[in-house]
Regions:
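Extracytoplasmic gate region of multi-pass secondary transporters
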Residues: 39-44, 240-306, 390, 394
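Intracellular juxtamembrane helix-capping segments at the cytosolic ends
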Residues: 46, 142-156, 163-164, 354-367
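Interfacial helix-cap and linker-helix signal at transmembrane-aqueous boundaries
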Residues: 46-47, 78-79, 177-191, 267-268, ...
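C-terminal ends and interior cores of transmembrane alpha-helices
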Residues: 93-122, 324-336
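Hydrophobic core of transmembrane alpha-helices in multi-pass small-molecule transporters
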Residues: 98, 111-143, 250, 340-354
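A late C-terminal transmembrane helix in Major Facilitator Superfamily
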Residues: 175, 367-402
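Symmetry-related core transmembrane helices of the 12-TM Major Facilitator Superfamily/SLC fold
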Residues: 195-214, 408-426
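C-terminal transmembrane helical hairpin of 12-TM major facilitator-type secondary transporters
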Residues: 249, 286-288, 292-362
Length: 439
């Protein structure tokens, strides 16, 4: 292989890389990063041990979401300059360091420097936790997420939808694995000490991500060159391309993140209305079950919708998932049955996940593979902004109008998705390739 074919000076295997192995390595990396979606698993133990308020533990997650989106924006242009392997190594370093710094913050608040009841000790512990898990870890999240999607898409130009769907599905599966398997086991092994559990998690993910990075190679120039779209230069002059792309991702994410933040409460309210004799424990169990099933739907939806986009066109499928999810939201206020409610919720969450599987390939088809990473990073800032706005706003609705909050939320989500669908159709005319199966 010539230097031209390996511009990043990455170590190469003796035989040609197996793109299936690279895809598997990417999924493992994303599954590690996806553990951030299971943050709520640790919130109650943290609040019990450190006496932090709900807004404090929520802020840590919001910082991680913001870190993912805005570090992805910064990482986008670097993919073409540094290559996938180098950036994924950076991602691993930041992500694992985030857990280690967070563990340090928790140890500081566990009596090392003073009583956690002392205000300055509590705040110092919280600030270090937020800096580690939220800021440092968030940088690792965005760097790895953006790089993995761009790199894997480059290796599978003939099946971009399926490949990117697999990658982002790994992110969703990682959250389910953390909340139901790894997290409980780490806490059990650590004796219920969150700081010790974070050290265990950092060690395990450090090994997994290191092995995954060793199996990642940037796409060979010959693999993707004949598939790279040439439309990017044609449409580069349009001043509103980035605005429409950002608004599409923002409005679509607003609907998903707002409901995800209230899933347990919504399910408990519906279950209690259907059977007022249910105990608090039974209601909590119903909420937890819906979260687990919806998480699985989120993961599977990322793959299925993306795979469908390979066969029926990116814009067609993206618009379909937005429109049908919007209709489901309109039905939800009238879903008094817990079973019907669960089915509708799982569908809208699966569609939310499907958007993440479809957007990277849609961007690549519209603007070319060379600009995919930078524009995908821009789109993720729309998601990050929605993550900062939607959960607090939906929580505000519950505080002010608890009896009508769910109904208002469903209609807002429906309107947001329909607005996103209109934005998608507004770019459909940019290139006919987006309305036909991928070449």
């Amino acid at each position: 292989m010539s230097d031209h074919d390996n511009p990043f000076n990455e170590p190469l295997p003796k035989s040609p890389p197996d793109r299936r192995l690279i895809l598997f390595a990417g999924v493992m990396l994303m599954a590690s990063l996806g553990s951030v979606y299971a943050w709520s698993f640790f919130t109650k133990p943290l609040q019990a041990a450190y006496h932090w308020a709900n807004w404090q533990t929520s802020l840590v997650f919001s910082l991680a979401v913001a870190g993912l989106g805005f570090s992805a924006l910064y990482t986008g242009p670097l993919v073409a300059k540094l290559g996938g392997r180098k950036l994924m190594k950076r991602s691993a370093v930041f992500f694992v360091s985030g857990y280690l710094i967070a563990a340090l913050g928790l140890y500081l608040g566990s009596g090392v420097i003073g009583d956690i009841q002392t205000p300055w000790v509590s705040w110092l512990s919280f600030v270090v936790l937020a800096l580690g898990y939220g800021v440092i870890g968030g940088i690792g999240l965005g760097t790895g997420y953006l790089t993995a999607v761009s790199t894997i898409a480059g290796w599978h130009p003939d099946k971009k939808g399926f490949a990117t769907g697999m990658i982002v599905m790994g992110f969703g599966i990682g959250a389910l694995f953390m909340s139901k398997v790894f997290g409980p086991k780490a806490m059990e092994f650590a004796g219920g000490n969150v700081a010790a559990a974070f050290l265990i998690i950092a060690g395990v993910y450090g090994v997994i991500m290191t092995l995954a990075c060793r199996s990642i190679y940037s796409p060979h120039a010959a693999i993707s060159s004949k598939h790279v779209a040439t439309v990017a230069d044609t449409y580069e002059h349009l001043p509103n391309v980035r605005v429409r792309l950002w608004l599409t991702c923002f409005t679509y994410s607003l609907a998903g993140l707002g409901i995800i933040s209230q899933l347990s409460r919504l399910m408990q309210d519906v279950s209690k209305s259907a059977d007022s004799s249910l105990s608090v424990e039974a209601l909590a169990a119903a909420g937890a079950t819906l979260i687990a099933i919806a998480s699985l739907g989120n993961s599977v939806g990322r793959l299925i919708w993306a795979w469908l986009s390979d066969h029926f066109g990116r814009v067609n499928i993206f618009a379909a998932l937005l429109g049908t999810a919007g209709l489901a939201y309109l039905v939800l206020p009238h879903a008094s049955s817990p079973i019907l409610f669960s089915i509708l919720i799982c569908y809208v969450i699966a569609s939310y996940g499907g958007g993440f599987g479809t957007i990277p390939s849609l961007i690549s088809d519209l603007y070319g593979s060379k600009r995919m990473s930078s524009l995908h990073g821009l789109a993720l800032t729309g998601w990050a902004t929605a993550g900062l706005i939607a959960p607090p706003f939906f929580g505000f609705l519950y505080d002010k109008v608890p009896d009508q909050a769910a109904t208002y939320a469903y209609y807002i989500c429906a309107g947001s998705l329909f607005a996103s669908m209109i934005l998608v159709f507004s770019v459909k005319k940019l290139h006919k390739h987006c309305t036909s199966p991928a070449e």
